[in-house]
Amino acid sequence: MNIGRFLLEKKYQLRGETNRTPPYSYTKLCKELVNIKELNSLTLSQHSEEKNINKKRLLIRHDIDHDLWTAEKMAVIESKYNLRATYFVLHTAPYFKKKFKETMEICRNIQSLEHEIGLHNDLITDFFMNNLDPGGNLAELLILFKEEGITISGTASHGSPIIQK
C-alpha cells in the first residue's frame, strides 16, 4: 500500500468513513463567507481604524509558520471573493532564510492582492538561540522588508516551543 495514500485517507477519516478529499475546501469556505449579509471583511489594521462598532466584521489572520506557498494560494482565493486578510510572516522559519528572495516575492504578491503583511515575531527565540538583540533584530527586519517594497502592518508573537520550555 502506498504510505502517502494511506496517511491521506487516515487524515480524512470521519466517523469510520474514508473520504479521499478533505471534508471542506478553503474556496468553499470563502464562498460561504461572502454570502453573509452586511459582512465587512477587513485586515487587522483596517479593523483598528474602523469607528463603526455596529458593523459585522470578518478578520482573517494567517500565521505563516511553515508553508508560504499555501498562504499565497489562500490569498488568491480570498482576493477572488473580495475578502481581506493579514498574513504574519515568521522570520525564523526555514523558508525565510533559505528562500529569502522567493519569500519577498510571495509577500509582495500577497500584498498586491489587498491583503496586509505583518511580522510573526520570534525575536526572543532569536535572542536565546542566536544571541541577537531583539531591538536591533527588529530594526533590521523592518529595513529588510522596506527595502523589498513590503509594508509591515503589525506584529504577532510566535510563541516558539523553545521559549515555552
Label each PLM-derived region with a short phrase:
Residues 1-61, 65-86, 90-104, 108-114, ...:
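Terminal accessory/targeting
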Residues 118-120:
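Glycan-processing catalytic domains of CAZymes
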